[in-house]
Each structure stands twice: as structure tokens, then as C-alpha cells.
Amino acid sequence: MAEVSPMMQHYLQTKEQYKDCILFYRLGDFYEMFFDDAIMVSKELELTLTGKNCGLEERAPMCGVPFHAADSYINRLVSNGHKVAICEQMEDPKQAKGIVKREVIRVVTPGTNTDMASLDEAKNNYIMSIVYTEDKYGIATCDVTTGDFFTTEVDTERKLLDEVSRFNPSEIICNEAFYMSGIDVDDMKNRLSITVSALDSWYFSDGLANETLLSHFHVQTINALGLEDYESGVIAAGALLKYLYETQMNSLDNILELHPYSIGKYMIIDSSSRRNLELVETLREKQKRGSLLWVLDKTRTAMGARLLRTYVEQPLIEKSEIIKRQKLIEALNANEITRDEIREYLNPIYDLERLITRITYQSANPRDLIAFRDSLKMLPPIKQQLSDIPCELTDEINEEFDELKDIYELLLSSIEDEPPISQRDGDIIKAGYNEEVDRLRDAKTKGKTWLAELEAGEREKTGIKNLRIKYNKVFGYYLEVTNSFKDMVPDYYVRKQTLTNAERYITPELKELEDTILGAEDRLTSLEYELFRDVRKQISCNVSRIQKTARAIAQIDVFASLALVASQNNYCKPKINESGIIDIKNGRHPVVEKMITNDMFIENDTYLDQHKNRISIITGPNMAGKSTYMRQTALIVLMAQIGSFVPAQTANIGIVDRIFTRVGASDDLASGQSTFMVEMNEVANILRNATAKSLLILDEIGRGTSTFDGLSIAWAVVEHISNPKLLGAKTLFATHYHELTELEGKLDSVNNYCIAVKEKGDDIVFLRKIVKGGADRSYGIQVAKLAGLPDSVIERAKEIAEQLLANDITDTVKSISVDTGHKHKKEHLDEVDMTQISLFDTVKDDDIINELRSIDIGNMTPLDALNKLYQLQNKVKNRW
């Protein structure tokens, strides 16, 4: 077998070091891929697969992309979850002795992509590190493009998944133990479209973590970073920082702080509730339009859009901080002219956070610096306008707000107003900034005059009227003579090229002139490149000032947006209390009222407290608006706790520590769970993790199983929630089980409400109004008629309904008295001063045995079998 070529030997050695990456290997004007990389990439990017002779018996599979267009191809691969290692030429191939020196300069992964063109400017691109140690999860999260860096610890799988859902990282790195901690990693990857990689154990050693963090942040002890109580968090943060060093291959100067946080610092919203409330995207379409963020986001900058998204996902629980935000919104709306002028000044500002990252990473081009300069121009007028908005939060923002005049003046004096995109093409540096640049430009300009004079002289000497001096990169400068005049060419012309219609020549004088002109051009281009790099470096030395200012701009943008939304939509400033009262007058759903075009949104009141009004049981037909009303209440509370004004006439909002929702129904087929099992899992999570300060939104609990089982579960859930010794949380509980309305009067904290309807013969009109009292009918047949079911089906349904009414259990429920207790009462319930209410007779053993005998196991799916087993288990429990 022939010997492998030196170039291919180097390729194979490099690929061995980056086995988990697609290797983009620079060869001239292309990045080439070989072997398996080439086969896979050619399919994904629809490139032509060719081959290259490299000393092997067969040609190596090969495909490639032009170097100037590589970013778009890399972004496509990274968005598909791949890692790309970029191996660059480190010297000019023309001057190389032997094989061209090449090195991997960066590894691009889903969580470390800094290309602004490919990222969603309104969303952070997070990478997360998770370490599992001794029943605890350390979590560190970073956005490389903005420098944001956080760490925390959690002690349960549920809390971990909630943090993953909140940050929604595009990439996770973890230790091997994480895969064995009980988390279904594959399911998490598929559901959230996250790339997950388990790294070698040495990444997660506490010694390396400490060393990496201390070195990067230039401190002597971990305590100096406020991390003394975050042992696992330190390991996760150190591993993540080490990984970023290895992939970015630079000093990460934009990561200036590590922020430890406790998940109890903000309102807790679990992943299910985030989806159900459609905070940042809709449940089905996964689109921003139709979400709460869509309504609130009138921001003018990318930084503001990202910060607003963070606010929506992290409502506050500290009253003073909420009121501080409210006062700024109120002040902005008290001076609408100033508010609108600030928004106008914000409009031209580019993404300062991501631009300074590109600058510190030495990847910013000349046009990036002009965008940066034009953004800085807006800072002084914005700061001036802020002086007209006096309040505590404005003062805090102004402390961080640096007008950066020195950097603006540097850019104004150094960089041309319309430079090329490439930093190596020249014409970047302004006249007057550097004497040598001015001198070389003068030589370049005179060179053009010299060329014009030489051309005129040669025409006169030779009599060739159409003689022209031209230039290309292959031949340099040359004299071009058409064929009709080639007989007049003098002997001292040296032919360089023959064309179809012309001949190209050089002369000793032209060659000498070329050396003078091109020498000046080459020196000028090289000098401009060095000066550009120096300007970029000067800016990067001010990264801390710039980041603080960018965050100040983001805050101003967010509050100006919230103020505008409040003004346009007639929102009110809610009172904030810590007594637990939620009192909303004429509340509206912030999203639905913007989506409907033909109807006026019907306003509704809500009142909940910690005593006699903890639980509202809401009955009424489908499509009447129960779910909208409950979500509306949750969103108003959430909006109040981000500091926003709310869609209501008046509102007094008691701070809640968590919002839980259980709405909707869908089978979790991927994990083999039925609608009912999904529902029960979510209810179990709520009952385990809610507190007396939480707000619960529960819709149709128990509908995924039989009527008796469903009613039993719903009844027991209400009992559990209503008992202040067990939970005592404020709850909106929508149900079709009208029997639950009997709990009003039996349980002190329960009150009945229903959605009003108006009957017109066999038809109904939904009034969308919440009224006191329980509904006595579900109007299901009327709703079916509205949906367009055939008349024959509707009539038959009426007949069956009349027969079933004779067996209605409502009267039985009404006659139930409070039981004195169960024979085998659970120990923890002995402390509860509330007796349990029995609904149904106990199940007999013979019934269960007969049902088991009748099951046709051969024709059951695994999912059917699981559901049947669950039903039988409940019946067995009912025996006691």
C-alpha cells in the first residue's frame, strides 16, 4: 500500500483528537471534509461527494465548502446537533516550507455558537453543565454570547427538569453519574431538542473546578465568589468553564462574573405550568405569537427582548423589588413624550452584548465596529432623557449606565464610515488617524496618476490609440492591445498572454512602476489590518463597562415596553400584598383579548384568600370559558409579580411563591403513559411541591378514568388542598363533576362558581361570565350540536341522557354526612382536624376476581394493560 500523504497524516492526527466533531480542514479557499465526515455532511448539506488521492489504495471520500461561506454551513450542522472543529491554515501557503501549518482554532457546538446571524436575537443561547453528586444536582448555565454565567444546586429530579425547562439550553454537558441518577436523559434530549454529552470524569473533579474558577476570576478563594454553600454548583461551573476554554480557545474575557442563585429567589413555575400558561410560546404551534411574551414584548433592542423573556420566566417574590419596577413603569407613563423619545433612541441600537463578545473574541469585522459606534451615539440622549424620570430604579440604572464617550470617539476617528466587511481588504482606517497610512495612501493615489501618464505616453509613442493599462491578480499590471493594432507593437514590449481579440504585454518601466504601487498597497493593507486589530483590542479592554451599559439599556428597553403595553391596553397598577389575598376586579386574559377580533372580551372578577375563600370550584359547559378564566387569573398574578401592570380595572395581588397548573389532556406515548397517568403524575407533583402560598390552577381532574374513580379522586384532591394542615393553597378548580359543588358548606374554604349560559330552546349562548353558585348541567349535548354532530346522533344522545338521569348519583352525594373517620386511618391524618367524606360503597374481592377472569390479555396493548392494572389497583385500595 502506498504511503499516506503528509497532509492526510496531519488530517488523521487532528481528527483523532476531535473524534466527536466534524472536522472542517482548510485547504486553500475551501474547508474540506474526508471519510465518514464527508459522507455524512454531503448528505445533510446536499453537497457533491467526491474523492481525493491521499496515498491510500482508494480515493478518500471528500466534500467541501468555500471558506468565505463556511459560517452558513457550520450553522446548519450545529443546529442539527453536531459539533464542528475548525482547522485553519496558520500561514500563507505560498510562503510555507513543506506542509502548511494548520491548527484547530475553535470548536463550534450548539451551546457555543457565537454567529449572530444564526442565533435568535430575542433568546439567550445557553449551554448547561450538570453534575450529579450524592443525591444532589449541581447546575451551571452560561450564554457565551452575552457573558451571563449562573450556578445553583437542586435536590430532586423535578427541580432539575424545571431548571432545564426554564433555561432551555441548546447543549448540556454532564458527568457519567448523571445518566445513572434516574433522569431519562434520552427522553429529555428528544423532548427539548438538546444535545447532551457526558464528559470524562476529570472534568468534574472539585480540584480542577476550584483551580479553573479561581484562575479565571482572579480570586484567592471560592468564598470570594459567594460559592461557599454551592459545592456541587462549583463543580458544575468549573467543568463548564473548562469546556468553554477548550472549545473557544480564547481567554473568555466577556465572562466577568459567576452568579450563584437559589431557586427560591423567584416564583417557581414548573415545566408543565410554563407550557400550559404559554408564557413564551404557544402549546401547539411553538410560536411566540399567542403567548404572554408576544403581548408584552414591544422592546426595541435584542438585549431588551432577552431580558423581558427572563423577567417573564422569573417573576419576583420580593414585594419591594416588584414595587420598584412598578414605580418606573408608572413614571414612564406619566411622561409619555419622554417614554416615546427614549424608545426612538433605542431603535437604532444594535446588540451590544453580543457585539462586545465578538470584539473580545477577535472575530468582529469592520462593519461590526461601525454598528457598535452607531449604537454608542444613542447613549448620551438616552441618559439625558432618563433624568426626566426620577425614581429609585432609574437611579440604580444610571449607576451602571456609562455613555462610553471615549470608545465612541476612538471609533469615530479610526474606522471609515462604510468599510468593507473583511478586515484584510483595506480601506478600513480613516484619514488622519495614522500618519503612515496617510503616506502610503498618497503613494497609492500618485501611483494611479503615474499609470495614467505612462498609458498616455505609450499611446503617443506607439500610435496605438486604444492601448490600455489594466490589472488582475494573476499578471499584475499589463498593457492590452487589440489585434487590429498588434503590428504596431514595439520590440521592447514583452508578450504575457494572447487572447482571442487582443494581446497583453509588459515593459520594464511598467514592471518597475508595478513594484512601487503594489508594494505600497500591500504595506497599506497590512498596516490597516494591524491598526484595526489594535482598535478592537482597545475596545475589548473595556468589556466590563460595556456589559454594564448594555444591561442598563436592556432594563430601560424592558420598562419602556411594559409601560407602552400598559398604556395601550388600559392596564392597571396592581397593589401588592403579603397577606395572600388575590382580588381582581374586571380582569381580562391578556392574550385572548388581543386575539379575538369580532367579540368584546368579557371581564370577570376573582377573589381568593387564605381563609374562607381558598378554593373556587368552577362548573359549566365546555367552551364556556372556564379554562380561559383560570389561566387569566394565573397570568394576572404572574404579570403583577414581574412588576408589570395588569389587564383589570383594579387588582390587589398577594404574592405567591409558586404557580402550578394542571390543564389539558394528552397521552405521553413516548414513555407509554396514558392521558390519565400523565394527569395523575402532574397532580401528584402539585400536591407534593405546592405550599400554602402557592396558586393552583386545576382543570378537569379525574376525567381520564371512569366517572366514579374520577369523581373520587377529584373529591379527595379538593379535601387535601382545603386542609391548611396538609396544604391550604389558593385554588381554582374547574370540573364537570357537579357533585363536587356539595363540598361548599362541608368544607369551610370552598366556594362554588359557574359560567353563566342563556338557553334558547335547545340551544345555548355562552355568556362567559363567572357567577356565584354551581351549574346543575354540563350542556354537553348542546355543545355537541354546536360542533355539528348529525341530528340523529344528537336526538339519540338526548334519549340516553334521560335514561341515565334516573341513575344520577347527585342525590346520594347530597345525603352524605360527615364520617367520623376510617377504621384504618393513615397516621399522618390523625393530626388533621377534618374528617374524610365517603362517596361509594367499598369494593368486594369477588368483583375484582371476576374482572380479572374476564380480561382478554391476548388482545390488549401494553398501554391498555397498564391502565387496567391501575384501575384494579385503585379498586383494591377501595376495599379499605
State each model region's role:
Residues 838, 842-880:
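C-terminal tails and terminal domains of large nucleic-acid-associated
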Residues 35-38, 230, 300, 311, ...:
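ATPase nucleotide-binding head domains, primarily ABC-like/P-loop NTPase cores
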Residues 322, 329, 339-345, 372, ...:
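Amphipathic alpha-helical coiled-coil segments
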Residues 1-331, 347, 351-360, 364-456, ...:
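Charged catalytic and DNA/RNA-contacting regions of genome-maintenance
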Residues 361, 365, 375-378, 431-432, ...:
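Charged, surface-exposed helical/loop "interaction arms" that form contiguous linear patches used
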Residues 164, 169-177, 183-184, 198, ...:
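Conserved catalytic alpha/beta cores of large enzymes that bind or transform nucleotide phosphates
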